[in-house]
């Protein structure tokens, strides 16, 4: 049981792309590059961001990763939060010595510009990456993000409350907000909490939702482990292996091919 409550406390902090669930990174049409370039040159940060997305789109003839990075940087410097987040993510993929300091700088700026992004900034404090580990500070930023409508922020705030053994009604309120906003790791964490403390069937249903709709691999594995019916076990085994295979696990790909013959 102690291990279960550790999972409840940490499950939401799986390193998911929480911001991409709020703001789509899909590129605009390739043929509007010139228009956005012109607006960007006039100081429009959003236009710089859109131009960067086009330059970053491999299906566009103008694709130029180096120039795209310049435009993302410019969009951030002009006060467009998405550009700052993109720059932070770009640094997260490097092994540069200044990696964590850069990520913190860009995420902090994004949080200042758009409170929805304070969730990502809070995660830096939760993990202690680029910032001294401080769960109280993380909790503050999660709440700030939640207050302006970021479901991920609400889910992370709920987990912070749960770790502090706050009233379960308060915890579930914020999990519900996160889950209803389609932040599916929130559904998983909510399901585990319900399963442990309230109603096992209802809890399992929320874990299923996290797997079925949100492709949360850990939720699929949990449902698989808790299932007693063979038909359900096979269904969730397939989903779990498929997600693992998509993550690059070659053994899970091989196992998936085996069960396709069942």
Question: What residue spans do the PLM features occupy?
Answer:
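Classical Sec-dependent N-terminal signal peptides that target proteins to the secretory pathway
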Residues: 1-21
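N-terminal leader/linker segments that initiate helical-solenoid repeat arrays
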Residues: 17-53
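Short helix-capping/linker turns of helical repeat alpha-solenoids
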Residues: 42-45, 57-59, 77-81, 93-94, ...
């Amino acid at each position: 049981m102690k291990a279960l409550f550790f999972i409840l406390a940490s499950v939401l902090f799986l390193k998911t792309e929480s911001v991409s669930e709020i703001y789509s990174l899909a590129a605009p049409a390739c043929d509007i590059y010139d228009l956005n370039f012109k607006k960007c040159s006039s100081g429009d940060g959003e236009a710089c961001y859109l131009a960067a997305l086009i330059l970053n789109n491999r299906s566009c003839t103008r694709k130029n990763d180096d120039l795209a990075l310049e435009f993302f940087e410019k969009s951030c410097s002009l006060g467009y939060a998405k550009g700052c987040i993109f720059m932070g993510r770009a640094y997260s993929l490097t092994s540069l010595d200044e990696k964590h300091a850069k990520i913190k700088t860009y995420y902090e700026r994004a949080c200042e510009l758009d409170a929805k992004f304070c969730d990502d900034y809070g995660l830096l404090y939760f993990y202690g990456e680029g910032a001294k580990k401080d769960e109280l500070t993380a909790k503050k930023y999660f709440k700030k993000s939640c207050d302006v409508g970021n479901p991920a922020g609400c889910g992370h705030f709920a987990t912070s409350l749960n770790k502090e053994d706050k009233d379960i009604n308060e915890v579930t309120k914020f999990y519900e907000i996160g889950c209803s906003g389609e932040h599916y790791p929130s559904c998983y964490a909510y399901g585990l909490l319900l399963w442990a403390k309230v109603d096992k069937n209802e809890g399992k249903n929320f874990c299923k939702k996290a797997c079925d709709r949100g492709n949360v691999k850990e939720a699929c594995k949990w449902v698989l482990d808790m299932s007693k019916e063979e038909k359900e076990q096979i269904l969730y085994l397939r989903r779990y292996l498929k997600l693992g295979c998509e993550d690059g696990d070659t053994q899970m790909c091989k196992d998936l091919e085996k069960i396709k013959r069942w």
